Amino acid sequence: MAMIRHSNSRRVLVAHNVSRGNSGGMARLMESIHTELESFGWKTEYFTADDMPASGGQRYRRYAFTWFARRRAREAFLRGEPFDVINIHEPSGAAIVLGRSRMGGPAVVAMSHGLEQRYWELRLRKDPPGPDPPTWKTRLLFPATSLWQSRFTLRRADHVFCLNEEDKSFLADRFHLHPENITRVFPAAGPEFSSAANRRNYDRPCNRVLFSGTWIERKGIRQVIEVFSVLSGRHPSMRLGILGAGVPASSVLADFSASLHSRITVHPPLSHPDCAEALLGYDVFLSPSFFEGTPLALIEAMCTGIPVVTTATCGMKDVVEDGRNGLLVAPGNSGAIVRSVELLINDSSLRRRLGKQAAEDAARKYTWRAAAEIVNAAYSGLLKSKADHR
């Protein structure tokens, strides 16, 4: 059914099953890039967890999200305002890629924030000290509900965005996607983080360590607990900060010895300026994840000039060069993390050199404008390809 288009602007629907304005990296990444895309002539609409019906429970809303997103796109088509591009998170895209013709034939871009298939295989390996293997219930339900949808979406989408080189290679080698149909997207940080770097003090005592991320096993929280337990015993003035946990402070503190609670600060959700200011209050940044895309929190930290200790995997090893702009350790190696932190504790010149190089690299490479230019090129290429094949 042909409809009369009422607008000449280029329209994109971003459909990701998280809340808008969420302090988590996924929402911030997508909103920041697409806000910047307005200067390229794009008009963005969002379909998020906030738009789902409150009834039915969390599991229902998760599985039904793809159908409600499809309905939103169909309604836009019927009123003469079809979307040119739909950016859909990989585990939620099956109904979108199946129903393109009923939505006006938009280009479909599958967005991965860390490939579901790769993390699933990591969990199945049972290689200590990696993440715990899935329960038998999860082994049955996850492939039958979410994992198949991720595979289907990635293979059927017109284009795929990913957040690290390992994922990009996996998509080409295992999913047999053409390299031209894969774009590596970078997270970025706003100017409030870069400007904070000018006020960092590398000469004060190094006794405050920060972990920023959701308080889940995949982020390496067991290693955070182990590392701080050791460091606090060796260094009486050592303090730990936790930012963006996504769970109540009481839940985080319950994972530590009660004797350490007075030395731990669990920050509430912070605005971007307040987050940049909070980062200035710490001396070392820990990112011990087993699996990620590329952590937005890592880029923000680097922008403020805080020396980082992170794992040599996923997007972390794409942006951190060991000994140049940060320190890399093997995933799960708590002892190596302790040694790296103590190396920084004992050497202010090393803290300064790594931190300043991190700030310089991040300010130069990881801006929202640069990220939007990459996304605009991919979107525009898809529209040109569609026009050429009409």
Which ranges hold each PLM region?
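Glycosyltransferase donor-sugar binding loop
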Residues: 212, 239-252, 268
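Conserved acidic donor-binding segment of nucleotide-sugar-dependent glycosyltransferases
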Residues: 322-323, 327-334, 343-349
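Membrane-proximal helix-turn-helix segments that form the acceptor-binding/catalytic region
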Residues: 131-160
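Conserved donor-binding/catalytic core segment of Leloir-type glycosyltransferases
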Residues: 201-228, 241
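Aromatic "clamp/platform" in nucleotide-sugar-dependent glycosyltransferases that forms part
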Residues: 290
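Short hydrophobic beta-strand element within catalytic cores of glycosyltransferases
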Residues: 307-310
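A short, well-ordered alpha-helix in the C-terminal region of glycosyltransferases
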Residues: 343, 350-365, 374-377
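Nucleotide-activated donor-binding/catalytic signature segment of Leloir-type glycosyltransferases, i.e.
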Residues: 251-273
